[in-house]
Regions:
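Hydrophobic structural segments
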Residues: 1-133
Length: 133
């Protein structure tokens, strides 16, 4: 993907340490303050590299696979994409569309407030649009 000044939709990188997919999922839950995530792949698989893409990450599945990462962390991964990636050896953690984008609100509020100090910039509270039971 085209990147401008280091900015763009997805990122790849190394996890803080080698960990199992299960540990990685717990780490994602902690970092994103989420009650749950969906996992495609073997929970005991060791992962060291990750691709992260906010929102719907289906379009980033192939680039993440081609980059050789162990796990794609994204939201809104559909059933077949998740299964296909796991079958190819790349695990997927679906943190949900909301889960991967909610943190952007305050970040963007701060950026806009700094760029346009004459404006009053507020972030709107958001929550998942559905309820897990």
């Amino acid at each position: 993907e085209e990147v401008l000044n280091g900015e763009g939709i997805g990122r790849t990188g190394r996890l803080p340490r080698a960990m199992t997919l299960d540990e990685c999922a717990q780490y994602v839950k902690t970092c994103f303050s989420l009650p749950n995530v969906r996992i495609f792949g073997e929970l005991n698989k060791m992962v060291t590299t990750a691709a992260v893409s906010p929102g719907s990450g289906k379009s980033m599945a192939r680039p993440a696979f081609e980059a050789g990462v162990d796990v794609l962390i994204s939201g809104d991964i559909d059933h077949h994409t998740g299964i296909d990636m796991a079958d190819c050896g790349m695990a997927v953690i679906d943190a949900g569309h909301y889960g991967t984008e909610a943190m952007f609100i305050d970040f963007m509020r701060q950026v806009l407030a700094k760029e346009y100090p004459q404006l009053s910039v507020e972030g709107m509270p958001v929550k998942e649009p559905f309820t897990w039971i």
